[in-house]
Amino acid sequence: MDFHAISQRFIDMMRSKNSQNASQPPETYPFYHEVRQMSQHPWMYEDPELQDYALSILPLDKLFQDASELEKEGDGSWGYQDYVIQALLKWFKREFFVWVNQPPCEKCGGETHMTGNGPPNEEEKWNGVRNVELYQCNVCGHNQRFPRYNRIRALLDSRKGRCGEWANCFTFLCRALGSRARWIWNAEDHVWTEVYSNKQQRWVHVDSGEESFDEPLIYEQGWGKKMSYCLGFGIDSVRDVSHRYIRHPENGLPRDRCPESVLQQALHEINIEFRSRLTDSERKALEEEDKREKDELDGYMRPVSQATPTNTDLPARQTGNVEWKEKRGEAGK
């Protein structure tokens, strides 16, 4: 069977899944409840006091100046707010947040190794910590904790972590700067951001850990990552955006957590609930946006040779050590 036939078979399979009906009520599927729970995540970004605190930290003059320079150098395809996000992305990656493989010893600065995991203490629980990694210094033997923070205020102060902390804090900062933003969850243990471009009238991929802007194929073509679900969560728009990131049949993993109709029903219900507080004109504008995005995502369902050429210039993953990336299937092809 040639590659075109394989591609068409994959498309037919996905269309068949999309038309699949659930034989049980949606509430009987754990994934239905998981999706609804994840939809609450972006609401933590809407705290006005927290946004004010973020604005007091951000180098606004520098970001706006850098955005103006990018706009002058650009070809007009992006708007000023898009350039603000690009400036934020550069600053966040290079100056603000720190990637942690193993934390250095807090006592002597030596290298450490992981000894296990432990429960969070009361203060850590309050800061959204569910897991604490335990490390021991290779030099002085000092034992220390590395709590995986989820609460935004704690992240703004600690300024370190891995992809979860990076995406969480960066997505929040996009909201603090006035952009519409989505927190993107991938079932294969990665998260990133999408920001809506008013200029281009579409949602744009942004990965703060990789300093990647509008490169949605970086995962499957750069990292060599295989994926199943990619779901986008915002305060006025939730959507299955998997087709934006999974374009080639060999990179698609089984979508078997629930029937497709159950997932679509969950997303539909969430959108209705989130938009119920909006005006009629605001809801109508979002419905038009939904149609444009559906057309975009459906376009990626065409045979690969027509829809998505392979880009061999996309980089392999930058963050994380080699062993960690290989274990996650993200070390590149």
From Swiss-Prot:
Substrate binds at E210. GO terms for biological process: ERAD pathway; protein quality control for misfolded or incompletely synthesized proteins. It catalyses: Hydrolysis of an N(4)-(acetyl-beta-D-glucosaminyl)asparagine residue in which the glucosamine residue may be further glycosylated, to yield a (substituted) N-acetyl-beta-D-glucosaminylamine and a peptide containing an aspartate residue. SUPFAM superfamilies: Cysteine proteinases. Keywords: Cytoplasm, Hydrolase, Metal-binding, Nucleus, Zinc. Zn(2+) binds at C105, C108, C137, C140. Binds 1 zinc ion per subunit. Residues 305-321 have a biased composition (Polar residues). Its EC number is 3.5.1.52. Specifically deglycosylates the denatured form of N-linked glycoproteins in the cytoplasm and assists their proteasome-mediated degradation. Cleaves the beta-aspartyl-glucosamine (GlcNAc) of the glycan and the amide side chain of Asn, converting Asn to Asp. Prefers proteins containing high-mannose over those bearing complex type oligosaccharides. Can recognize misfolded proteins in the endoplasmic reticulum that are exported to the cytosol to be destroyed and deglycosylate them, while it has no activity toward native proteins. This is Peptide-N(4)-(N-acetyl-beta-glucosaminyl)asparagine amidase.
